[in-house]
Amino acid sequence: MEIYQFHNLPFCPKPNDGSGLYEAMLEAKDEGKIKHIGITSHKFTIAKQALSSGLYETLQFPFSYLTDAQELNLVEKCKKLDVGFLAMKAMGGGLITNSKAAYAFMANYDNVLPIWGIQRESELDEFISYQENP
């Protein structure tokens, strides 16, 4: 498995925190079962802890053109630390209706992989057209 991400836990797993979660992932990595350890969160404090820990290779966090300065700083910090950033809620959880504007915003961040949440083939066609005709 390329990436194993802890998903939206109420804390940031770390070695010796008593949960055994991070140790289990290190063991899986040592055994070649996973290549990278990541984390997802909806909470800024947990995302910040994950980056500060130096333990995670990816961070999945809400990010869109509705984002604020502290979230932009997360993206910049990920780039500096060479941590992959996966943007969940790239369409603002349904608040953004202009997919072209959302795509143009994301195109400004070469270290961000957006998760578009495509539900229909027509939506997929829209995003493919933006890629083919920037």
Please place each PLM-identified region on the residue numbering:
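Active-site gating/metal-coordination segments in enzymes
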Residues: 1-5
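Beta/alpha (TIM)-barrel catalytic core signal, keyed to glycine-rich beta->alpha loops juxtaposed to Asp/Glu
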Residues: 8-134
